[in-house]
Regions:
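Glycine-rich phosphate/ribose-binding loops and adjacent secondary-structure elements
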Residues: 134-137, 146, 150-152, 157-275, ...
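Short, solvent-exposed loop/turn segments at secondary-structure junctions
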Residues: 9-11, 42-43, 120-121, 169-171, ...
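C-terminal extensions of enzymes
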Residues: 117-123, 276-349
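Glycine- and acidic
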Residues: 121-126, 130, 188-193, 301-304
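Non-catalytic, usually N-terminal nucleic-acid engagement modules in DNA/RNA processing proteins
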Residues: 1-155, 266-269
Length: 349
């Protein structure tokens, strides 16, 4: 288990100096496990430069106007040195550069942090992707230099690993080029980033994995649905992060071995069974379907919390089972068994 914290949001509130004074992000939240921080690049750029309404997309069904914001609507502007952006909290102006991102993340004190990168969409032009990739390459070099300086300066602090981020959208030549370029740099591991069309995700991750050093870990950024985790594992990814477990919880969706279902449905109003009978999480061992149904319809924030606890437990437990099946040599049997049941149940939900 690990937690990935958002450098952009922690920078704005409560501020990296407070987290640093608390002993780092793990100490600040009393979390005993490993921690990651992202670079802030995705959130900054999603304010307008890269994304308008959506990120997780199927390129065949999403229109450019749904993704690329008009210049006047943008809350962030990118140049070769960094990004200037307007806070979504109070409208104040801020500037992120590769060096500043490293400074913020060193103060946040996570075990693993990511280099500052420009995250593009599937709908940016090829020429823009080429220019963006070169910008990300140069930013990666600047991140490494600043990371090394800060590591020396803060030598009394625990070492923080730095991962480079591979971009290139849906283009094989750009993905492979990025993996070769960053793979030759002195990173501790690599994140595979950018908007990924689900239909081509496995192929893209495989392109990247074939070019990266075999002895360094690969993290698949923003991927966390059960089917996608299996695809990522088979394509060479080692770790994952995603907000989907909490995002779907806010819409009353519940993960189960029989697929995803919605606890707000009327059939759960008088069901006093556990939320998911086979689950050992805090929510399922303490509360009934009827109670969660009530919380959702009463618009109680507790509903989001309890459903998030369950959904996170479900995904973390799934990854543990995948790991065990790989160790025992029964991965494909486990995959078929899980997806056959999950897919059938989801179709009925």
């Amino acid at each position: 288990d690990a937690i990935l914290a958002n450098a952009y949001h922690l920078y704005l509130q409560p501020g990296p100096d407070i987290v640093d004074d608390a002993g780092g992000v793990a100490s600040f939240m009393n979390w005993p496990g490993p921690t990651f921080t992202d670079s802030g690049g995705f959130q900054v750029l999603s304010l307008g430069v890269g994304f308008k309404k959506v990120l997780a997309m199927e390129s065949q069904t999403v229109q450019r106007d749904d993704v690329i914001a008009d210049h006047k609507e943008r809350l962030a502007h990118v140049d070769d040195d960094g990004v200037t952006f307007k806070s979504h909290l109070d409208g104040s102006m801020h500037r992120f550069t590769p060096e500043f991102s490293m400074q913020v993340q060193h103060q946040l004190g996570a075990d693993i942090m990511f280099a500052f990168d420009e995250c593009t969409t599937l709908l940016n032009t090829y020429d823009y992707q080429v220019a963006s990739l070169e910008r990300t390459r140069l930013w990666a070099l600047r991140c490494i230099a600043e990371h090394e300086r800060l590591t020396r300066e803060r030598s009394t602090k625990p070492y923080q690993a730095l991962f480079g981020v591979i971009q290139g959208a849906q283009y094989e030549d750009l993905r492979r080029l990025a993996a070769k370029d960053l793979g030759a740099m002195d990173f501790d591991g690599y994140g595979i980033g950018g908007a990924l069309d689900k239909n081509s995700m496995s192929t893209i991750v495989r392109w990247v994995s074939e070019e990266l050093p075999a002895n360094k870990p690969r993290h698949l950024l923003g991927i966390g649905e059960p089917e996608d985790i299996f695809a990522g594992v088979e394509s060479g990814a080692d770790t994952f992060d995603c907000v989907s477990a909490s995002r779907v919880a806010r819409n009353a969706a519940v993960y189960s071995l029989d697929g995803r279902f919605n606890i707000s449905n009327a059939r759960f109003r008088r069901s006093f069974n556990p939320v998911v009978a086979e689950c050992a999480c805090y929510t399922c061992t303490n509360y009934t379907q009827a109670y969660l149904h009530h919380l959702v319809h009463a618009k109680e924030l507790l509903a989001n919390t309890l459903l998030t606890i369950h959904n996170e437990y479900f995904i973390v437990n799934l990854v543990k089972q995948i790991r065990q099946s790989l160790i025992s040599g029964h991965y494909y049997d486990f995959k078929d068994q899980f997806l056959n049941r999950y897919g059938t149940g989801r179709a009925k939900a």
